From Swiss-Prot:
GO terms for molecular function: rRNA binding; structural constituent of ribosome. One of its GO terms (biological process) is translation. This is Small ribosomal subunit protein uS5. One of its GO terms (cellular component) is small ribosomal subunit. Keywords: Ribonucleoprotein, Ribosomal protein, RNA-binding, rRNA-binding. Part of the 30S ribosomal subunit. Contacts proteins S4 and S8. The keyword NAD does not apply. PANTHER family: MITOCHONDRIAL RIBOSOMAL PROTEIN S5. It comes from Streptococcus sanguinis (strain SK36). The keyword Ribosomal protein applies. Residues 10-73 form the S5 DRBM domain. Belongs to the universal ribosomal protein uS5 family.
Amino acid sequence: MAFKDNAVELEERLVAINRVTKVVKGGRRLRFAALVVVGDRNGRVGFGTGKAQEVPEAIRKAVEDAKKNLIEVPMVGTTIPHEVLSEFGGAKVLLKPAVEGSGVAAGGAVRAVIELAGVADVTSKSLGSNTPINIVRATVEGLKQLKRAEEVAALRGISVSDLA
């Protein structure tokens, strides 16, 4: 679900900068890789990566990439509709809904994605690999898996009150 309108102001957050080298005949070629998360704090979030010889250029490319990959996050009040466990590579991320007022209990890369998505109350646990890019990808994958009660009821062909 990519959104093309740039009318909404998106907030950007730099998650990681990595210095990468390529060994060539004449020595080492140095470049920088940036990982950026963007979101409107109102249910839309995306991430992007960029690589360049200078840090600011890598960040600019990452922001451009992130704006092309926005997803819609279903929410129930200030939290997520249900618990979800998602994997990407060696990283696993568990997201659990939390009661209103409990805040975002998440670390590092997961916190950036959750906060910019606009989710105010959630508990999370990162398992396995802690590589920022894989953690961000696993978190976004988890947010994509979320479904509202109405969607689940429609898929099952029953009313929302019959779900419980």
